């Protein structure tokens, strides 16, 4: 049994906990502790009730600063300094670092000094970590000596498996990406101050361009794609599910049917459970709570002049990513034991 702790219990932290119980991986992973500065009553309430993902079916109780889920007991901590967390006494194998604020190796080492054996960051990190993993593509690079690993981003997890499939079958010369991302909690409900002037504006009233490092994230996973991609991102007034508009120029000449067939076969084969494929007339909310990293919308595939291909990809940017956090942590332990 892998003993884990969650540091930072926001959207991703709570999704990880809920995904653990829904995915069937509870027999492999035990959440021992949650470190979150919010009040315990709010922690319990937001675990039980969620506007996006609905009510959590197991009954959640608060007893003496402990979260009870059935027979499981999870200690709730409120320690702002990771170096002071009781990971050694709790025998923590992996910390899910989900604050969104601790993103480099040096900061994550505080968890290691506190006694955790490994750290998995739920965010793109600095380049000094031991590895950045997109599960399904490069988890085989994990090694026993790796202590600090990044799970990349939700959009990197969405797009990299698709690029990998296209490149292996047709060769990818270059690409351009537009991420159409749901609003996030770094935006404002009504106009208010923010360092990014566009994010001073009400999230529910505008389509808001934001900076993205997605192209650099692709390069980190697929180094041979360096300088081949550029990306932009806009936030839209929905609370969950993201679409990615991917355009790639291929080495080979293709048609729509060939591209869709290759992607559908990959979704049903090597990337089963990671990629999905649909030719139904669906909309974003139909992918809410979908555990896969990416779903290709075959109805929107387009080919121009035989080599320019446009795809539409969907992902639940919370739930799919949370499920990959679980998968990557299991792969980290497997590598450590090999």
From Swiss-Prot:
Gene Ontology, cellular component aspect: cytoplasm
Reaction(s) catalysed (UniProt annotation): D-erythrose 4-phosphate + NAD(+) + H2O = 4-phospho-D-erythronate + NADH + 2 H(+)
Keyword Lipid biosynthesis attached: no
Keyword annotations of the record: Cytoplasm, NAD, Oxidoreductase, Pyridoxine biosynthesis
Localization annotation: Cytoplasm
Statement: the UniProt record of this protein carries the keyword NAD: yes
Leader sequence segment: none
Active site positions: 154 (nucleophile)
Disulfide bond residue pairs: none
Pathway assigned to this chain's UniProt record: Cofactor biosynthesis; pyridoxine 5'-phosphate biosynthesis; pyridoxine 5'-phosphate from D-erythrose 4-phosphate: step 1/5
SMART domains referenced in this protein's UniProt entry, alphabetically: Gp_dh_N
Enzyme Commission number(s) of this protein: 1.2.1.72
List of residues binding substrate: 153-155, 199, 212-213, 235
Pfam family name, one: Gp_dh_N
A biological-process GO annotation: pyridoxine biosynthetic process
Marked site: Activates thiol group during catalysis: 181
GO molecular function annotations of the record: erythrose-4-phosphate dehydrogenase activity; NAD binding
List of residues binding NAD(+): 11-12, 317
Record-stated family: Belongs to the glyceraldehyde-3-phosphate dehydrogenase family. Epd subfamily.
Purpose: Catalyzes the NAD-dependent conversion of D-erythrose 4-phosphate to 4-phosphoerythronate.
Assembly and oligomerization: Homotetramer.
Protein name (Swiss-Prot/TrEMBL): D-erythrose-4-phosphate dehydrogenase
